[in-house]
Amino acid sequence: MTDYYEPTFLFRQNAIKRFSPSLSPISSVESLSLVDSNSISNNGTTTTTTTTTSSIYQNASNSSWLLNPYNVKDTAILNQSCCLNRTNVKSNYWKIPDESMNLTSMSINKNQGGNPILAISSGKSESNLFIYELNLFNNHLIHHHTISLPNIHAMKWINNTRYLVTGNNKGYAHLVSTPKLATHDVFNTNSNGDFDYNDDDEDDNNSAEICKRFNHRKHLKQNQLENTISTPIKHLNFLNNHENLLSIYNDYLFYWDIKGCHQQTRPSPISISTVSGIKNFDVPEKNHSSTNTSSANTVAICGLFGVSLFDLRDCQFNIPNYNTAQIHDKTQSSYRKLSANIVKWNPMNTNILAAGHGDGVIRLWDIRKQDSYIAELYGHNNYSITTSMEWNNNDLFTGSKDGNIIHWDLSNISKDSQWEENDNTKLPISCGLKEGFNSIEFNGKANKLETKLDQYQCGTILPASNSSIVAMCSTTTTTSSNDHDDEEIKILSIDSSSFLGVHNKVSESINVNINTNKLYYTEEDIQLLLQSQLNNNNITSSSATGSNDTLISFGNNVSQDSLVKPLTISRKPTTTIKNNNNNTTTRPTNTHTHSASIDESIVSVHNVSNDTLVNSPTRFNICESEDEFTFNYVKNNTNNEDQRQSDNRNSSFSSVSSQQTQLNNSVESLSTVVTDVENEVNHQEHKYMSLLLPVKDTSTTTTTTKDNNTNSDQAVTNTPIISI
């Protein structure tokens, strides 16, 4: 009998078999523990010391059906299903001050020559437009402005300018001039001279202003407004190098001339197209590597009708006839499979576009094969609506209402011959996740994982939020490594909990092997530590050049508030002399002239690092007033007259010191008063001061003095500098 309770075996076979090559298929559970214990005892002492970890695991419990965490084949299923192998995904989050938690849209301005500028909007009626500057290298989010522009539901920046277009829930789109930023000259000026509005008034540059208003409801007939439900402006975007504006209001697609709008008091649209059930559109980006030579007036639209191409010159739209093999009936699943709520062109190949459909599946379409899609991406929860998509070369990032962002690596799929062949009889390519329960195909007989032959595993899931992903955008940063520059993509997301997330290095996970029995550093570990320490020293020495000019130049990409670095006050070294009467005299360590200040305190200015503040080697000496001084006189065998003179001097210094001490207490000063009064002491006390040797400011030294009454040496120790 055991000393503790053991549950009975409820199952004849384990749900996940424990891997053991020495166990035959017909062996019992008891034989498994016997084999393991015999193998350890027969191998002697050497085997016992080398297998300490496994023996600890076996002695922890007699229930040998438990999985061995130190056996790779035992944990392969759990690691892949629970995404335990992912170690190189980093996310940073900031809370957006929106009490209603109703964030609606996000737009990023690349801001060539500076940090990207981020605009986040809310559906509130006031204080609902937030302008931020994002420092991607130090992961700093700097708030610049908060603007009241009620009920924003869509917006878009005009790149390299401080103008953006917003759309609200009442059918108005506004061209808004945002205030200038104090630290970015490139963002404050127009790049190519376009949209050159009057910027001579400094007061106007420091406030937001609505430059133009685009009224959508005004240009619709009264019967059209009565028969439709009023909805906000769903989506807007620029085309033709920011010369034209496209916007969706209700079931209408508006086409505006944004370049010539300043010549019109009330701008009118170029065309209005009726597209029943339209939800989104996308404009192909101009790229020299693109293989499509179609007109720039062609846009991709999606909605209840599915995915279609729209020619702005024709302004007519008819629902296409889908007679595909995949959609052959009118069931609910087929309807969801047909409808789409978001579409995005591939900037590297404008023949390819991605669409998020109502059944939660991302489908890739080739405009040269209009009868069917070419690939399906399964990763989000069933019927979870895809809210945003971003391309990065051949990588696709999708965000959904399930709170997940999935990175799809389509580099291998794009090399597949099916992408270029015009044979419509081939089935679409199926893509799944690398990790998660859906990625597991377990062979019970062989006790190992198997790869699905009919599916590419190219999706990496990132649990970005516990709520819905509202919007998403991307930006790139350039990092120098060796002799070339690498571009690293950053994915920005906002969710329904009013959090802004920045996710980087979303790539294939790295397999990190950690040896728990490792006791000593290897030669490679020492070299890595030395190299890391050398890099940190180089960064610290280069950033701490020790002048206010360097401090300002370091803060070129930050706001004025962040230029104020935190200060620390250090303790000045002092000396103490002890005698036989247990009296202590505080002596100064430095000698100064009468014109010099008596007191000095060292103020250290810290440089900003990514996560923590470290002490800078550069220190600035700031002279303080001569009032801070305390002096406790040591009684000795002298005449009364000399003692009275010394007491008078001591009282005069003490009175001045008390006033300054009260001032220091009010500001909670941490500096130690150090003064030099050698020239003020009477020549009769010179025999005491001659025993005190000068001490350096920044080092801890010890001097020896001899008392008059005894011949024993007394140690005089300087207190080292202590940073608070």
Curated annotation (Swiss-Prot):
Keywords: Cell cycle, Cell division, Cell wall biogenesis/degradation, Repeat, WD repeat. GO terms for molecular function: snoRNA binding. Residues 714-724 have a biased composition (Polar residues). Residues 571-594, 648-662, 699-713 have a biased composition (Low complexity). WD repeats lie at residues 98-142, 147-186, 228-266, 334-375, 379-418. It comes from the Eukaryota. It comes from Candida albicans (strain SC5314 / ATCC MYA-2876). GO terms for biological process: cell adhesion; cell adhesion involved in single-species biofilm formation; cell division; cell wall organization; filamentous growth; filamentous growth of a population of unicellular organisms; maturation of SSU-rRNA; single-species biofilm formation on inanimate substrate. Residues 569-596, 638-667, 699-724 are annotated as: Disordered. This is Protein DSE1. Belongs to the WD repeat DSE1 family. GO terms for cellular component: fungal-type cell wall; Pwp2p-containing subcomplex of 90S preribosome; small-subunit processome. Involved in cell wall metabolism and required for the separation of the mother and daughter cells. Pfam families: WD40 (PF00400). The keyword Cell cycle applies.
